[in-house]
Design a protein with these regions (language model features):
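Catalytic machinery of carbohydrate-active enzymes
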Residues: 1-213
Length: 213
């Protein structure tokens, strides 16, 4: 099991098949018209990322956001990041209809994100660094590993930089700083970015680059 390999490829290797994961494997007959022009969001209870700018997204796009998921997930999200509209769904097909009808999906590694991937819909994914197994690189998807995010929705442009701690650990790589309270998080952020870019260094080598600041 290789770090950064997605779950679909792991299952395919076990089953000795070679699916074309670049093409959609889910479809929706009637996308939900209610989510047209909106951003569908979701955040499950597990698999959270580091420094993902949820609060800034809510502040900038609150009126355009529609949350799908469990009621308790919506409650937790609003408690942490601000109130957003909730769209009740009776099953995962209704979640798929909501995502398919929207302009964009933003979410962490959860079932709505898996549905979005199956649809190959425009996506911004909050990546979990200790379970980095939902990596599907495509032109209309961003994998956010350390909070840096830029995108456009309607007439608005959004740009966010990670809110790193004032003191902690860091790795400087290609003139970019990866900062965190714990050294292993610096390594994890860099390691994830290298996988997305097609590069590779050993964990031991990256550990040697960590310094205090």
């Amino acid at each position: 099991m290789r770090y950064g390999e997605n779950i679909a490829n792991r299952v395919a290797r076990w089953m000795m098949v070679k699916p074309d994961l670049d093409k959609p494997w889910l479809s929706v007959q009637y996308p939900n018209p209610y989510t047209k022009g909106k951003i569908v969001i979701s955040r499950g209870a597990r698999w959270h990322g580091e420094y993902f700018p949820w609060k800034q997204i809510v502040e900038e796009f609150k009126d355009d956001l529609v949350f799908v998921g469990l009621p308790e997930e919506h409650y937790t999200f609003c408690s942490l990041f601000g109130n957003v509209e909730y769209l009740p769904t009776k099953d995962l097909y209704e979640v798929a209809e909501a995502i398919a009808g929207s302009d964009l999906f933003i979410g962490n590694q959860s079932s709505p994100n898996a549905i979005c991937e199956g649809l190959k819909h425009d996506c911004i994914q909050e990546c979990c660094l200790y379970a980095f197994d939902c990596v599907f690189v495509r032109n209309n998807k961003q994998h956010i590993t350390h909070g840096e995010l830029s995108f456009t929705h309607g007439t608005k442009s959004f740009n966010a930089s990670p809110s790193y701690p004032k003191h902690g650990h860091r790795i400087v790589f290609n003139n970019y700083e990866y900062k965190a309270n714990q050294p292993h998080l610096c390594v994890a952020m860099l390691r994830a970015d290298l996988i997305l870019q097609g590069g590779s260094y050993s964990v031991e080598e990256m550990n040697s680059w960590v310094e205090r600041y």
